[in-house]
Amino acid sequence: MNKVFKVGLIGCGHIAETYFRGHQYFNNFKIVACADINQKAAEKCAKLYNIKSMTVNEILKDKDIEVILNLTIPQSHYSVSKKVLNAGKHVYSEKPLATYFQKGKELVALAKQKKLYIGNAPDTFLGGGGQKAKELIDSDLIGQIKLGNAIFAFPGVENFHPKPESWYKKEGGPVIDMGPYFFTTLVNLLGPAKQVQGRTLTAFKLSLIHI
């Protein structure tokens, strides 16, 4: 019989619903508890999905929980994942792994040191389209790829997200939040980047998040 991993979720915000909806299709892990710095959010989530509500410290100390799902805001991914690894648990984090490259490398090194697994979204490159493209490239059916181009445009996170404020803070924004989907796909198809450059533009100095 396959082992069923007991998972604790930290961060009961907007994206948590997607994970709860999707995890019912898997038989090798089960979300059994949730935590949030906003205790009311954790209690609401626990009631909705019939699981335990805990504090962050409680969920990290629970010996029955082997894996933590880190769904906090991007600015907190590094600190929360580090606490999880130091608590002796495996961690899967929403993207990005960290908002700074060196901190991401530190987490990977810490996981190796403690012989724990660390995983990170996005997993969308494993979808049918991405895998078919990789198959065509790896088989040399379409020749050597010289250029990859990915474009993402939408009216703004404030149009759908209940709490978009973190997008407008330091270490937030579309490159950090949405960029990983496209960077991950391009790296998976074409290999690691040898050189990176960037350019930004601020269209409006003042934005209204909610009216």
Describe the predicted segments one by one.
Residues 71-72, 152:
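Glycine-rich, N-terminal phosphate-binding loop of Rossmann-like dinucleotide-binding domains
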Residues 54, 92, 117-119, 149, ...:
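Structural detector of well-ordered beta-strand residues that form the stable sheet scaffold
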Residues 1-49:
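N-terminal Rossmann-like dinucleotide-binding module
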Residues 33, 66-67, 147:
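Short, Asp-centered acidic motifs that coordinate Mg2+ and/or phosphate
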Residues 50-58:
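Conserved SAM-binding strand-loop segment of SAM-dependent methyltransferases
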Residues 124-208:
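Predominantly a Rossmann-like dinucleotide-binding segment in NAD(P)-dependent oxidoreductases
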Residues 66-67, 73-74, 78-125, 140:
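Beta-strand-loop-alpha-helix segment that lines the small-molecule cofactor/substrate pocket
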